[in-house]
């Protein structure tokens, strides 16, 4: 790519220069469009639900459902092999009679499997019969797993097979129930099977979600994850579900933190009030059960019959289900091309309810992007129990068409307002230990939280003191909030990834020209700038920061704010970590763009005065998704946690940072304003 200087003074032949011009514009399109273009789908509906018993029980065999070989062996021992050719109910009842005389693990397992097969056959016609048989499967699987009088081998594949039978029988029963009833915590159900009556109370066992948060439920097994590399599941008992959040009282100001149709993981477990004793079938009549809803992000195991048992969980599919919405894919383009239309959309977002005691990690996206760009890292980070037990992840959405210092000012205000809403009494210490993670331009937005402006930032706007600038109240307030600020005392650590600390050569004459054609500058910015120039002739020169109206302009190497940010000393309580992408030497982009990630040169992304710096072999669009970058962020979060936990035990240490936080997002002491004409 030609540099700005070369483009201005080149004496190359016209055809060569035209080719370079075309290449520059093409690079603009590829560079800017790619981050906003995620995968077509994040989750797709399967033709049939995923079922771990499919191969074992020959779901797709020409001869139909068949018991496993070990169950066939049990049937042969009791002379029941010839009873397979029927609906399965008679076979189950005959096997159950043998089992009552000899209640051993093998017959428990065989009864569970035969009952499950019979239930699947009955489900297409007689759903009450199917529910009855699924209930029998649940009881036998439960007894196989937990009856204290049985001797079982946990290394035997049948042990895991019994878990699968329990889970699949419960899921299949829930599918039947969901066709007729809404499963919501706090509700009660009356279920009639062929021979029994069940009183089912649905209870919510999470401290995060409330009964009214549940709008609808989907089965995680119905969906295949497409847009996320790794899928995180936990193996145990229960049915993983996707819960779609109900939009609650919009008058609650905290409601703005949650995106519409947010989905979250749930694991459902059925607990019988009374389980038949060993060797006994479940009697007819009425039975009471609890259908328990657990949050697998906070509850990994539960007590069953005096034993701690892990929950079956799926953390990734609910995330992919939420991301699979066309409206989310439109956000990057809207935020870049027309920042004005972002009004009401920008701000801080959560994918879980606020959790007191957990440290917020705020992830800030880059140019022509949105929080979706963080989902790969987020999915990987929260798979670690230590991370999800101590951290909560927040995301910042902002219009990327405007200069990054304007976005930084808005984020400063939004963080302050969030503190007021979430912790009005200021008693929550975790909110004084925020970690900011910024990719690309988001790193610059984050870095502007780490130091106090003094007059240095204003001097990139004008050499005339601000108290002499004439402007009305709103325009003056905006100037002061954007160009005068203090280091954010709630932020303790920042991580910048693929950040153009010295600008990017891709922000050259051609890309900046194209950006001005693409981006609609916010009307408030235009009116404010026009008023300032009209009221203050001669106070602002051509190099003033006020003349920079788009994000592409703000990322140019000659942007006057970048040297100020490099020279500014960060607050004494602040830690800074840096991650740099470098493409392999043989890559075509490396040969064209030089050493770096293809968009940001190494010399621009590299920093000397940081706590740590990691070089990752990745291009600009993938550096924050690269496994080594994710591992580095996880390492930093563990270090952050260790330092916080160790601090009270160090009597010689001072406070980690000032405890005073300006909740109103005030700037440094305001100078006296000049009168407006």
What are these regions (language model features)?
Residues 1-18:
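N-terminal secretory signal peptides that target proteins for export/translocation
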Residues 33-36:
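C-terminal motif of bacterial Sec signal peptides marking the signal peptidase cleavage site
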Residues 70-77, 122, 371-372, 404, ...:
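Short, solvent-exposed loop/turn elements at domain surfaces
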Residues 115-190, 361-367, 393-549, 597:
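Serine-dependent carboxylesterase/thioesterase catalytic core
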């Amino acid at each position: 790519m030609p540099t700005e200087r070369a483009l201005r003074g080149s004496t190359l032949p016209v055809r060569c220069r035209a080719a370079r011009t075309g290449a520059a514009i093409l690079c603009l399109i590829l560079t800017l469009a790619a981050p906003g273009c995620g995968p077509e789908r994040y989750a797709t509906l399967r033709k049939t639900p995923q079922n771990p018993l499919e191969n074992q029980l020959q779901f797709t065999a020409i001869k139909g459902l068949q018991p496993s070989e070990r169950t066939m062996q049990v049937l042969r021992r009791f002379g029941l092999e010839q009873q397979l050719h029927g609906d399965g109910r008679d076979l189950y009842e005959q096997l159950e009679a043998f089992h009552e005389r000899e209640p051993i693990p093998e017959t428990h397992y065989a009864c569970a499997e035969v009952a499950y097969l019979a239930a699947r056959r009955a489900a297409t016609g007689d759903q009450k019969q199917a529910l009855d048989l699924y209930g029998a499967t649940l009881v036998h699987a439960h007894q196989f797993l937990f009856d204290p009088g049985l001797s079982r081998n946990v290394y035997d594949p049948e042990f895991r097979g019994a878990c699968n039978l329990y889970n699949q029988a419960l899921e299949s029963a829930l599918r039947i129930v969901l066709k007729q009833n809404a499963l919501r915590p706090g509700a009660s159900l009356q279920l009639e099977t062929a021979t029994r009556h069940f009183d089912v109370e649905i209870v919510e066992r999470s401290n995060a979600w409330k009964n009214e948060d549940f709008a609808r439920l989907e089965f995680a097994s119905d969906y295949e994850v497409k847009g996320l590399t790794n899928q995180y599941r936990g193996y145990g008992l229960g049915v993983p579900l996707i819960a779609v959040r109900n939009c609650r009282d919009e008058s609650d100001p905290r409601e703005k933190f949650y995106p519409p149709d947010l989905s979250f993981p749930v694991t459902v477990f059925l607990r019988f009030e009374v389980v038949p004793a060993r060797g006994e079938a479940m009697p007819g009549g009425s039975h009471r059960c609890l259908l328990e809803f657990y949050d697998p992000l906070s509850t990994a195991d539960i007590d069953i019959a005096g034993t701690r048992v892990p929950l079956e969980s799926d953390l990734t599919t609910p995330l992919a289900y939420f991301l699979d919405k066309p409206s989310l894919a439109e956000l990057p383009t809207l935020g870049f091309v027309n920042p004005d239309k972002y009004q009401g959309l920008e701000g801080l977002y959560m994918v879980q309810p606020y959790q007191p005691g957990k440290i917020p990690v705020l992830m800030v996206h880059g140019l022509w992007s949105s929080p979706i760009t963080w989902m790969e890292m987020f999915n990987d980070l929260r798979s670690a129990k230590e991370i999800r037990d101590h951290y909560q992840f927040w995301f910042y959405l902002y219009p990327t068409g405007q200069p990054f210092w304007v976005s930084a000012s808005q984020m400063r205000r939004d963080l302050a307002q969030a503190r007021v809403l979430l912790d009005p009494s200021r008693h929550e210490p975790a909110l004084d230990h925020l970690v900011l993670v910024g990719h690309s331009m988001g790193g610059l937005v984050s870095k502007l939280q780490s130091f106090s402006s003094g007059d240095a930032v204003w001097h990139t706007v004008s050499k005339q003191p601000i108290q002499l600038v004439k402007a009305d109240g709103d325009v003056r307030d905006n100037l002061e909030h954007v160009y005068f600020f203090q280091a954010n005392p709630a932020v303790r650590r920042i991580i910048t990834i693929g950040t153009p600390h010295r600008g990017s050569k891709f922000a050259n004459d051609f890309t900046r020209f194209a950006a001005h054609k693409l981006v609609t500058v916010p009307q408030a910015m235009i009116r404010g700038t026009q008023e300032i120039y009209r009221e203050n002739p001669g106070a602002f020169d051509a190099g003033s920061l006020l003349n920079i109206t788009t994000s592409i302009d703000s990322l140019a190497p000659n942007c006057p704010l970048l040297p100020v940010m490099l020279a500014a000393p960060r607050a004494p309580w602040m830690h800074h970590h840096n991650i740099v992408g470098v493409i392999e030497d043989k890559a075509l982009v490396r040969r064209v763009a030089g050493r770096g990630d293809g968009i940001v040169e190494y010399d621009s992304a590299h920093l000397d005065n940081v706590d740590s710096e990691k070089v990752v072999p990745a291009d600009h669009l993938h550096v924050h998704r690269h496994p080594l970058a994710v591992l580095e962020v996880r390492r930093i979060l563990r270090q952050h946690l260790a330092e916080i936990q160790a601090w009270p035990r160090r009597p010689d240490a001072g406070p980690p940072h000032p405890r005073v936080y300006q909740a109103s997002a005030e700037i440094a002491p305001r100078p006296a304003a000049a009168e407006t004409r």
